[in-house]
Amino acid sequence: MTNIRKTHPLMKIVNNAFIDLPAPSNISSWWNFGSLLGICLMLQILTGLFLAMHYTSDTATAFSSVTHICRDVNYGWIIRYMHANGASMFFICLFMHVGRGLYYGSYMFLETWNIGVILLFATMATAFMGYVLPWGQMSFWGATVITNLLSAIPYIGTNLVEWIWGGFSVDKATLTRFFAFHFILPFIITALAMVHLLFLHETGSNNPTGISSDVDKIPFHPYYTIKDVLGALLLILVLMLLVLFTPDLLGDPDNYTPANPLNTPPHIKPEWYFLFAYAILRSIPNKLGGVLALVLSILILILMPLLHLSKQRSMMFRPISQCLFWILVADLLTLTWIGGQPVEHPYIIIGQLASIMYFLLILILMPTASTIENNLLKW
């Protein structure tokens, strides 16, 4: 008799995705981040659901309701901090996952990659709207500054901003709709993640060498299930260390002051995971130019398959490209640091140089390095 997991219509889908899935025998821990992102997403939906049970999306009571969750709700403080720091863990895993894709040429799976970029945008939108909900100073001013960027769009900009606000400023209507979108988007992300996985399983996983591994496959279970469990334990360990010891390490103290439209904080800045893009935005003196650079800094990922000129898929055997990749990582860390600094000398010029370097590396230097490496192969 055939095993039920191979015949039952629902079990069969799970079986083909997580149990009998043929996986390359040599994928490293860099391939763990997909499952970790799944865990982060489930954790965020669960903690978010319990927070939504006690939260009120009204400007008069939003801040108080978050305080109420932390003080009066049973274990409300841990749910709140798991949700806030869970977002940070989510983005750490996201950046690692995207970095892995860039390094090992995973972007050559076009559908999987493009849906991944859409997922990145959706997650960033969700995180931004979630940051507005506690209605602290940084929530309010962050929402004001970021939504205002749309006013740079010629002709329709101002109308578009007021349409998103639901009035002439960030107010009650804005908070309510942000809460609605923040609630629905994670479910859209879940659906997209399933499509992401569906397309991945059409081709099978890439591996560190970038060479076809069809001749050497092993079943996903038990080999990679146990490996994913280890990754999950480490993820939860780091998350709980953050939550239980330094819950406000990655937050902004300004957000413990209730939103006040009459008082601007000295330094308006987003959460740490947006700082690199924020630095690119600020490094261009023109408003529309800055907005375009901001969008392009993420949208540039769509171009990666077109910019791939190498005869080899992975960077494993390409030392020049490897060197440029790690310079890009250092550049992004520099941008993240600059994004959190005030707009003054020397931070302005460092930010501008790092922004130029970012686009230069991806659009010109890395494709050039690929061509050089191709020619070196002939020697």
Curated annotation (Swiss-Prot):
GO BP annotations, alphabetical order: mitochondrial electron transport, ubiquinol to cytochrome c
Gene3D superfamilies the record matches: Cytochrome Bc1 Complex, Chain C
Keywords noted in UniProt: Electron transport, Heme, Iron, Membrane, Metal-binding, Mitochondrion, Mitochondrion inner membrane, Respiratory chain, Transmembrane, Transmembrane helix, Transport, Ubiquinone
Ligand binding (heme b b562): 83, 182
A GO cellular component annotation in the UniProt record: mitochondrial inner membrane
Topology term for the membrane: Multi-pass membrane protein
SUPFAM superfamilies cross-referenced by the UniProt entry: a domain/subunit of cytochrome bc1 complex (Ubiquinol-cytochrome c reductase), Transmembrane di-heme cytochromes
Cofactor(s) this protein requires: heme b
Cofactor: record remark: Binds 2 heme b groups non-covalently.
Ranges annotated as spanning the membrane: 33-53, 77-98, 113-133, 178-198, 226-246, 288-308, 320-340, 347-367
Major subcellular location class: mitochondrion
Binding site for a ubiquinone: 201
Annotated compartments: Mitochondrion inner membrane
Binding site for heme b b566: 97, 196
Pfam families: Cytochrom_B_C, Cytochrome_B
GO molecular function: metal ion binding; ubiquinol-cytochrome-c reductase activity
Record function comment: Component of the ubiquinol-cytochrome c reductase complex (complex III or cytochrome b-c1 complex) that is part of the mitochondrial respiratory chain. The b-c1 complex mediates electron transfer from ubiquinol to cytochrome c. Contributes to the generation of a proton gradient across the mitochondrial membrane that is then used for ATP synthesis.
Note: Heme 1 (or BL or b562) is low-potential and absorbs at about 562 nm, and heme 2 (or BH or b566) is high-potential and absorbs at about 566 nm.
Family statement: Belongs to the cytochrome b family.
Subunit structure: The cytochrome bc1 complex contains 11 subunits: 3 respiratory subunits (MT-CYB, CYC1 and UQCRFS1), 2 core proteins (UQCRC1 and UQCRC2) and 6 low-molecular weight proteins (UQCRH/QCR6, UQCRB/QCR7, UQCRQ/QCR8, UQCR10/QCR9, UQCR11/QCR10 and a cleavage product of UQCRFS1). This cytochrome bc1 complex then forms a dimer.
Identification of the protein by name: Cytochrome b
Source species: Redunca arundinum
